[in-house]
């Protein structure tokens, strides 16, 4: 982590994010027997972060990214997946998307509907929300039936303040 997006706390920096990272390490050990080590990297520059992870990667069997702000987290994860020969996971994206997808699948089962019939509202447009929306698409949801909201309202094609990741889910439907 670089501590730029700690849940409920925001950008608190790498040292302040240490307790969260230590807690994740305990969960890895307790539930899977995997020894994990917290590593806090003191930079907000994606290139520096990527370079630091690449330098230490040979020591580890996998990398779990955590609490890195969007949209930088997407580029960091993409590059590390491409450039390293060990598994790389961004917990804020993938962990949340897995749980939300399980809930969506269950809701579809209980309602007797198919996922491609669902009208889905994603409240948020950060790393977790984007990953959830992408996972919903992979499960069969229709892009034109996903409405994403951020702190400024519905993410629409008419807005000029969207980064490239938010534009992926911008809607042109009247909402």
Regions found by a protein language model. Give the residues of each.
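Short, glycine/acidic-enriched loop or turn micro-motifs at the edges of active sites
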Residues: 69-70, 94-95, 153
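Residues at the C-termini of beta-strands that transition into short coil/loop
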Residues: 40-42, 92, 150
């Amino acid at each position: 982590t670089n501590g730029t997006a700690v849940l409920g706390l925001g950008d608190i920096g790498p040292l302040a994010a240490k307790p969260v990272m230590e807690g994740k390490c305990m969960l890895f050990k307790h539930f899977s027997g995997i020894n994990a080590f917290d590593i806090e990297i003191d930079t907000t520059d994606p290139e520096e972060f990527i370079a630091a992870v690449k330098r230490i990667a040979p020591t580890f069997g996998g990398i779990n990214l955590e609490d890195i702000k969007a949209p930088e987290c997407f580029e960091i994860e993409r590059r590390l997946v491409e450039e390293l020969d060990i598994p790389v996971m961004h917990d804020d994206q993938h962990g949340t998307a897995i749980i939300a997808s399980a809930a969506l699948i269950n809701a579809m089962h209980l309602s007797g509907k198919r996922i491609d019939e669902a009208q889905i509202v994603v409240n948020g447009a950060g790393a977790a929300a984007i990953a959830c929306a992408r996972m919903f698409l992979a499960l069969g949801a229709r892009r034109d039936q996903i409405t994403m909201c951020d702190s400024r309202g519905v993410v629409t094609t008419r807005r000029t303040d969207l980064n490239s990741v938010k534009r992926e889910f911008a809607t042109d439907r009247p909402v």
